[in-house]
Structures are given as C-alpha cells and as structure tokens.
Amino acid sequence: MVVSFSRVMASCLRRKSRSCVEAQRRLAHSYSIDPSDGLSPEQKEIQRTAKSFALNEMRPHIQEWEEQELLPLDVLRKAGALGFGALYCSPDYGGSGLNRLDSTLVLEQLSSGCSSTAAYISIHNMCAWMLDTYGSEALREAHLPSIASFDALGSYCLTEPDSGSDAAALRTSAVKKGDYFIVNGSKAFISGAGQSSKYLVMMRHEGEPGPKGIFCLLVEDGMEGFSLVRRRRRLVGTASPLELSRLRIARFQCRT
C-alpha cells in the first residue's frame, strides 16, 4: 500500500517519539521503483543475465582488481562469451545486435558489480561500434571478432594534454605520404592503455582546421612510432598517456 507524503509527515508531527528519519525511510520505501518495470520479457532476461554476472563474477573481486590496477582479462572474456564485448554491433562479426536501451541495461547492471570494469567495458564497446559503423569491410573482418570476444581490448583515444576532450581542438595530425599516413601527436587519460592491443585514435587530417578535419585510424600495439608513456591512477580505473611519433599507417585503413 502506498503511504502518502502528507500522512507520513502528519504521523511524524503527532508522535514526538517517532523521528523524522524514520518517516523519511518509510516514504522512500513506499515509493521504491522496480528497475524492470516497463521492460519486455527479453529485456528483463538481459537485465537478469547482466546482474547475475556482476554479482558472481565481478563484485567479489573489486578490491583485488583495484589493488592490481589491471583489467581482469579472464572475466572480460567471460563477458565476451555472453555478448558484452560488442553490444550494439552487427552480428556479422560477433556483435550482439542490441539497441541502445538493451545495452544500457547491461552496463547499468555491470556497474553494480564493479564500476571501474563496467566503465572500461562501455569504452571498449564504443571502439567496437566505431569500427563496425565506419570501418572498411576488411577492417571489420580482421578486427571485430577478437574485439567482440575480448580476446583483444580496445581503447578510445580522443583526449589530449593541451585540448582535453574537445575534439575540434585536437592537434594529433596525419599527413599523407605515398601509400601511408604519417601520424604525430599525443593522447592522455586513455583507458585500457597498456593492456589494449587496438587503439581507435582521433586525429586531424592534413592540418585541416575545425571538426570537419577530424578522422580516425586504427592503431595496433607494437607499431613503430607508437609508445605508452606511463600509467596513472584515476578515481575510476587507470589510464595512460600515449605518444605517436612518425607512426606509419597504411592508407587502405581509411574507408573510401
């Protein structure tokens, strides 16, 4: 039975022995919301699956992961087996094909298990979506299956030391030279850096100013000219600056 606000507060005033804290507790309990209200049976199942994974595979290990300051690769691969590595990507190369609401249900529940790991999973999914939406067929075929399964981790590289996350002001540049782009610049606060093997890097094409000059290339760990500077501890997870110095990337990586 729902207890009205006026009745609860009147009861508090009439009975001096009853504290207002208790009245507020009763009011909050009366108006609690079931997080599955309004969801379809399929969405409720998605929610239950993610919640069970968060409680059983993530929450018991929070302290250990925070102390190690590393992403739990074994648990991420279990998440990949459930389809959490490419939530809103096409099933063609391992994506789950969920819509944004369904994906939000998953990430919301995972956050109840470990917010740091869930935050990284959301970033990994951003990388998967960008590659699935804008990558060439060759790139999608070569990289999406391993990203979807978490066999390969992805990092989204936008933020820079001088411009923050203002995409229109970024300075990392790519200049055409023959069949390659020559990339120079730096990135900061890159989640997953050091454990990721695939980096979606936003950069400026041929020095073209403004937002229309921004495009993205896939950079793989180990490429000559790509280096990790150092890891930094943050409130949610760890992140690292990256340096790109005369990094050569084949032009076929751009979608044409």
Feature names for model-found ranges:
Residues 97-106, 166-170, 251-252:
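Structural signature of FAD isoalloxazine-binding scaffolds in flavoprotein oxidoreductases
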Residues 21-67:
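N-terminal organelle-targeting presequences
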Residues 224-254:
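Flexible, small-/acidic-enriched active-site or ligand-binding loops
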Residues 172-175:
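A structural signal for short hydrophobic beta-strand segments in well-ordered beta-sheet cores
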Residues 1-33:
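N-terminal mitochondrial targeting presequence
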Residues 163-166, 181:
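Hydrophobic, small-residue-rich alpha-helical packing segments that form membrane-like cores
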Residues 81-153, 192-198, 210:
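Internal helix-loop-helix
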Residues 184-228:
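A short core secondary-structure module
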